[in-house]
Amino acid sequence: MADWLIGIIMGAVEGLTEFLPVSSTGHMILTGHLIGFDDDRAKVFEVVIQLGSILAVVVIFWKRLWSLVGIGKVTDGPSLNLLHIIIGMIPAGVLGVLFHSAIKEVLFGPGPVVISLVAGGILMIVAEKFSKPSTARTLDEITYKQAFTIGMFQCLALWPGFSRSGSTISGGLLARVSHTAAAEYTFILAVPMMVAASGLDLIKSWDILSTADIPLFATGFITAFVVAMLAIVSFLKLLSRVKLTPFAYYRFILAAVFYFFIM
């Protein structure tokens, strides 16, 4: 298959699934397997196109991101600030640094991904069933305690297949944060976390990179960016009408497909 087509297909899958609670890792592994793109180059490619998805968040939430560092103000009252983000980053950041190699060796495989797809789906159903009325209906109403709770749930996203948004939105619901506010916080929180993780992976995989792969990486990056933009905007609108449960059932189906076609 031509590199440009691989770039478009994989970039579209990454952009569509990175911020939905369905596991981008599971979809990337499955798609790569189906089109025969699953070598060492593919691993570096996935890191690069993740940056395209991150750029989509930066573009959509640029005013909010500027306000976090004291440039501009999105509301006259109390608002989300940089400390909310730092608090949310600490749990997964610490675990990620301490156990980065172990996570890559133990959890990056078909078996662990199938388990996490199912476990993540169950978590989402439980969160919907046992969540109480929201005390934080907007992003600016999130407390430091709620930010820390969401950050703790983000630790689950270190397990490939669990889904960052699925884990953190579920944590937000259990901490009495609304669906939309939890999702928006999740997307903003993902920017520093994913940049750090992708940067670390790129440094460790630098010797695999080749100038011959630039067209492939560029195509995937641009595709992931465009599709992620559309996916984020659509998902935020959808959350006001549809809860996490349908995504949980989809994860169960994906786990079955993964089990029969990959394992």
Curated annotation (Swiss-Prot):
Keyword Oxidoreductase applies: no
Top-level taxon: Bacteria
GO cellular component, one term: plasma membrane
EC number per UniProt: 3.6.1.27
Principal localisation: membrane
Catalysed reactions listed for this entry: di-trans,octa-cis-undecaprenyl diphosphate + H2O = di-trans,octa-cis-undecaprenyl phosphate + phosphate + H(+)
Tagged with keyword NADP: no
Alphabetical list of InterPro entries matching this protein: UppP
Recorded coiled-coil stretches: none
Molecular function as annotated in GO: undecaprenyl-diphosphatase activity
Subcellular location: Cell membrane
Membrane topology designation: Multi-pass membrane protein
EC class of the enzyme, as a word: hydrolase
Keywords: Antibiotic resistance, Cell membrane, Cell shape, Cell wall biogenesis/degradation, Hydrolase, Membrane, Peptidoglycan synthesis, Transmembrane, Transmembrane helix
Transmembrane spans: 17-37, 42-62, 83-103, 106-126, 142-162, 183-203, 216-236, 242-262
Annotated Pfam families: BacA
Family: Belongs to the UppP family.
Note: Bacitracin is thought to be involved in the inhibition of peptidoglycan synthesis by sequestering undecaprenyl diphosphate, thereby reducing the pool of lipid carrier available.
Function of the protein: Catalyzes the dephosphorylation of undecaprenyl diphosphate (UPP). Confers resistance to bacitracin.
Protein name from the UniProt record: Undecaprenyl-diphosphatase 2
Source species: Bacillus anthracis
